[in-house]
């Protein structure tokens, strides 16, 4: 079943709703577009900062970043707007899968990105909630230099 006859109030992440077939095709496309926009915004900021990066054709990672020391994996999580005073991101990953080296949390309405390491405790097992003030910090260089 692709869609429901009655609209439902979304109380869980869009990824979960899509997985169980509760999103219409239009909602799934909109969710995919939000995610793609976040990926391109994150990679453009990295490129402008002088890092060589590319999108990844992988289900485990969204991109790769080349630093002087090594190639890092990137996971981009995108939220289109603030909800309940926080930005909410679906951060559950599959059993046995390795987390990416770097996470980029994108707030599309602010056009701002919060970067953190994949082993940072701020990333919760299922859903990560970030306040808007975290997006005012310049975290990209700090996080990427921590791998050198």
Where are these regions (language model features)?
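Mixed-charge (Asp/Glu-Lys/Arg
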Residues: 1-59, 66-148
